Amino acid sequence: MIHFVAAGPGAVDLITVRGQRYLKEADVIIYAGSLVNKGLLEYAKEGCEVYNSAYMTLEEVIEVMIKSEKEDKMTVRLHTGDPCLYGAIREQMDILDEKGIDYDSCPGVSSFCGAAAALNLEYTLPEVSQSVIITRTEGRTPVPEREKIMSFAAHGATMVLFLSTGLLEKLVKELLAGGYASDTPAAIVYKATWPEEEAYVCTIDTLVETARKHQITKTALILVGNVVTHSHYERSKLYDPGFTTEFRKGRDS
């Protein structure tokens, strides 16, 4: 059996209980060495085979999985954050389907949740934004035409951008062209939840300058929207005394 396990955003203690158990039981661990906290490998039992996929191709990763399966070993494929976002897991799963090899997924904490925690943010504030757009700036990997930053920016919703720190000048131009005001709040969160985490609040207009000042060129998330400064929002209906729910009756004002 192959277990695709979410490593969490960085901090070792943010892996799930199930994910930790799988790591302890694994005979083989293939981890995304470019981003996964190597402290998680301390859960591996003695004799566990450990592979760093940063140095491997897809074919080489699959080869290890097939060998492990033939030897009746349990394999953990350890991906950063939650691999349902930019995790390149589907291509692995499709090949495993072709080979008739069973697998499952163990979800976890995505780095975009870690970024919110770094700034104590709520992405969905009443009367400010009730939607979160998770996307990336187009680089070497193309983005579908209908999913360009400009088209998403037109919504004015909260936006979380992965894989975009090295393309900030392009990102800023597209955000402004799409309709965001230049003074729209923004933030850069570097290595969210890691010991070396850094978080800086700025505006769209000062994103490039802020990243340059703090020498951040990769491994960061970009947050955009008025929720970043959490001002001018309305109180939630859920805890309003006059709001009736399944569990309590609202009181007349």
For each of these PLM feature ranges, what is it?
Residues 2, 71-75, 131, 139, ...:
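A contiguous loop/helix-start segment that scaffolds small-molecule binding in enzyme catalytic cores
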